[in-house]
Amino acid sequence: VRTFYEPDEDEEFEAAKDLIVRRCAAWAAERGSRADEAVLAAALDSRHVSVDGRLAYWGRDQVRRFLCEYVPRHIIADQDVLERAPESLLTLLRHLADTGLLDPRGLDPDALPAAISEAAADYPDIVADPRRQSLAKYWTLLALDHGVDLEDQDALDRFQQDIDAGRVPCDHELLDELAIAQFLGEDQEDGRAFAQPPVALPPPAEVAEAAARSETVRRLTLLYEWADDQPLTAKGRLRAADARELAALLGVESPQMLLAWARTAGLVRVVKGRLRRIAKAAPLVRDPEALWRRAFERFFELGAEIGTGDSILSEWFDEIIPDVLNTLYGMPSPLPVARLQETVWLACQEKYLVEDDEHWRAGVDADLDAAFAALATLGAVELTHGIADALYSSDLRPSDDGDEPPPLPPEVCERLLVVLAEPGPLVHLTPLGTSATRARMLADGRDVPLLGELAGAPPAGLLGVLAQHYPEEEAAIELAGWLSAHDGDTEPLLQAVRDCPYRTRASAMLAVLAGAHPDGPALLTRLRHDRVIGPIAMTALVEEGRLSHDDLTADDQLAMLTEAMLALLEMGGPEAVHDQLATLPTPAAHELVQAVATSPHPAPTALTDFHTLIATPLLRPH
């Protein structure tokens, strides 16, 4: 089972959700823990529709979002189920931890109860507030209150007619509030963000040194020291002589943008017509790295001060520029500014619904250039000039099979193919800019892997994350770091594979371990004879062509057959198994099911599922 599915993998996600909920409910019953299946399923739903989509990643923000936003907004259940939702959530998270599914980059399992208790303090009042529900939930509850069968379309149609005719009493004031919330998007879930590649960051000392070298940090520090009760004009601007003095001090033509930046960063303020430094900002100014990060965070509020200040980009600066930096994040080589100009212009056209006007386009391009110049002076990006890497033009032509259309309109692709053939301005994030951009994405709840962050992860968590979120090269680097921190011992990793009750998960864990380990092929060959891992290892060896069916004994073949059926049940649910069996004559299907059900396969949890969902119903005498 995976704990990450793309938004369009509906069937795969639903099968995984059903499996995890079923296993968790059984696990909870054995321990006497609360586990309402509606809450378990909703918790997984809430993570699937989130910005990062990681079902098993839970921190304080995710816990609070589920209990204080998702449950009151969406879940329709008995009052007792709603009241005890925090208990059911804790059971789910404990089950994820116990089975090795919990993402180690979230809260430690020991810290989860406190996070749930913290959110649960506000939960009763929030879940009882009708203004927290969605419009869809309001109408669904109203229909249920009137005895409408939600599975009966005719009954639903009659109920709608009664509403239209005014025969169903409604809370119109509440409806107005819910409709406004829906219109403003307040009741909408976050859209899934693009996955980001794992990156490496320099040591903290190097980051601090880079911040101290920033020209913008130097200028903001000088400005802070200079701004000692300076008089302003009636329009709130520096007097001409003072502006010239400050410009000379800072080494700029005009100090206006830096003044705005300093005010936005909380370094100076205007008091009774005079510019004064803020005393509480003194510790910040003395810490170059802290000042750099404050300046970076406040940069996105400077749209009106960057460039011309009156282009479309300035209006949407705080939305578009972060997306531009996210695009630069993790790129293996400098990105051509021309390509970014095209995508930024397309984004601006969507915001304003303007045609491809040369005047507006020139203003957007100029402001984007000005933004890059300011970020370069800050030290967040580096600007160079040259031929762009072929990577940035390789997707501009239609693919040979036509399956993947270019990501941009045809006329834009044609324009870029011409421009990118010649040298031009290039931009990439500096290590400092990468660090700051990553911090922003982390704050937004996005998945932004960092090479080295899993060195202390539990074995199951390490392999699970590598299998789902790391490319091969980065997985090998991360695995090497983990082994280095654990005396090169692979046995804990192999034991994690053995302990995993989800066979498809165990297979993925073994695959990433063998693929990233220097002695992976030899490891797989040795594991062929492992009592628990053997069926998975043999399957991998056969798929790789390093083991033929002639090399397999009858017991080996039965073990592999059982492994395949258990994997099919996990991935597709009972329906997938029934579909497969339907391709066989009935006697052969029954014989196969009997063989799997009585197999000595070393996966008791998966075999129990097979007995319950497949073998018992199919082989029961009629």
Locate the predicted segments by residue.
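Structural detector for internal amphipathic alpha-helices that build alpha-solenoid repeat scaffolds
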Residues: G464-Q468, A475-A485, Q495-R498, R505-G515, ...
